[in-house]
């Protein structure tokens, strides 16, 4: 027999244990960027829905690279980002054990979209959520003003409660996603005033992110169910003549300690994990009401970001959207949280100015020969189905 090694590096990363299903489908932001009071008040994250992927062409601006000033083709992800609605504000107090919630103030009127989030069965419920709370505004809102004054006096961190407008997306879901987003910039009083002014009002994505910015994406990955140890951990397949299976771990531990260690690779859940993907460059923040939001300086074709036939398993995008470089966690239709980067990225890729030359809007189902219906009609002529 040839030389055989009796040791090897372990298979699989132990830094993401336990590999189990996420508690919620929405990506939860556990850390926000550091606050800078010299800047104006602004949100630090946003909610959107993953629509699908496409392809772009641009000139690389990277001196020293062999592809400098040459065209490159890159994969991008399109995130549908209808405006979010501000419905509340939360004040946090710093304690020796971390942040503690001081109080929460809700807006006077909440839509049924967000009220559904508080019910397990909306149709069988009495739909009385927040009826008593909204009565606080009847008496000139004195009690609400006192709670806001408490936040201004004692709180050190201010976060707003926002929800998505899921009815503006192609999704059949009626229940909005509710999230807590930190406000950065200005004093605590300025943050509370900003939150109160935006109660029951919408905030667009272009007021949070801009082109060429590096952001993070927090989402739940695509689920794959119960998976074997070879695919789940990448362990080596055993020799052909191995007794009772090849895609297994031959030794799962010593006699003593008389239990299986937590670090041993085992079969189980793969996917549907909560993950944060960092440093995605924003290639474009598009407007939904622009009929040429997929046009560029080099491609003057009047077309929208929605490809022919719509995004597969999603549909058409009629709202504002964000184009991000590369792929992001999650499946189509999944809610994703876009967060400002926690640190200032000074790499060449982060500082590079991106100018898109062409955005692919061909059908994502099949070969995709045509970019617009007009181009298809000009090539094929009048079809029998159009008569």
UniProtKB/Swiss-Prot annotation:
GO terms for molecular function: RNA binding; structural constituent of ribosome. Its main location: cytoplasm. InterPro entries: L3_arc_euk, Ribosomal_L3_dom_3_arc_sf, Ribosomal_uL3, Ribosomal_uL3_CS, Transl_B-barrel_sf. SUPFAM superfamilies: Translation proteins (SSF50447). GO terms for biological process: translation. Keywords: Cytoplasm, Ribonucleoprotein, Ribosomal protein. Belongs to the universal ribosomal protein uL3 family. PANTHER family: 60S RIBOSOMAL PROTEIN L3-RELATED, LARGE RIBOSOMAL SUBUNIT PROTEIN UL3. This is Large ribosomal subunit protein uL3. The lineage of its organism: Eukaryota, Fungi, Dikarya, Ascomycota, Saccharomycotina.
């Amino acid at each position: 027999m040839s030389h055989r090694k009796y040791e090897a590096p372990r298979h699989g990363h132990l830094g993401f244990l336990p590999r189990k299903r996420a508690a919620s489908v929405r990506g939860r932001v556990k850390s926000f960027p550091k606050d800078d009071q010299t800047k104006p008040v602004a949100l630090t994250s946003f909610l959107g829905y993953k629509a699908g992927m496409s392809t772009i062409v641009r000139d690389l601006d990277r001196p020293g690279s062999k592809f400098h000033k040459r065209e490159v083709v890159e994969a991008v992800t399109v995130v549908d980002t209808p405006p979010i609605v501000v419905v509340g504000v939360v004040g946090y107090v710093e304690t020796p054990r971390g942040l503690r919630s001081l109080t929460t103030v809700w807006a006077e009127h909440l839509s049924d979209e967000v009220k559904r989030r508080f019910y397990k069965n909306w149709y069988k419920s009495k739909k009385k959520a927040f009826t008593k709370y909204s009565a606080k505004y009847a008496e000139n809102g004195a009690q609400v003003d006192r709670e806001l004054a408490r936040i201004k006096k004692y709180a050190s961190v201010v976060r707003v409660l926002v929800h998505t407008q899921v009815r503006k997306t192609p999704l059949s879901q009626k229940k909005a996603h509710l999230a807590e987003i930190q406000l950065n910039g200005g004093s605590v009083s300025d943050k509370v005033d900003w939150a109160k002014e935006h109660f029951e009002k919408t905030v667009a994505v272009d007021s949070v992110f801009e082109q060429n910015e590096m952001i993070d994406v927090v989402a739940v990955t695509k689920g794959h169910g119960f998976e074997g140890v070879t695919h789940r951990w990448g362990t080596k397949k055993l020799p052909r003549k191995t007794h009772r299976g090849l895609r297994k771990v031959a030794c799962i531990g010593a006699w003593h300690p008389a239990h299986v260690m937590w670090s041993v690779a085992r079969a189980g859940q793969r996917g549907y994990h909560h993950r944060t993907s960092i440093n995605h460059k924003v290639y474009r923040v598009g407007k939904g009401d622009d009929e040429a939001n997929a046009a560029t300086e080099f491609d003057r074709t009047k077309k929208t970001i929605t490809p022919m036939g719509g995004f597969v398993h999603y549909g058409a995008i009629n709202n504002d959207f964000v184009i991000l470089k590369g792929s992001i966690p999650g499946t189509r239709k999944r809610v994703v949280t876009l967060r400002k980067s926690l640190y200032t990225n000074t790499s060449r890729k982060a500082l590079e100015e991106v100018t898109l030359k062409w955005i692919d809007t061909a059908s994502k189902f099949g070969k995709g020969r045509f970019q617009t219906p007009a181009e298809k009609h000009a090539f094929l002529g009048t079809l029998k189905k159009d008569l």
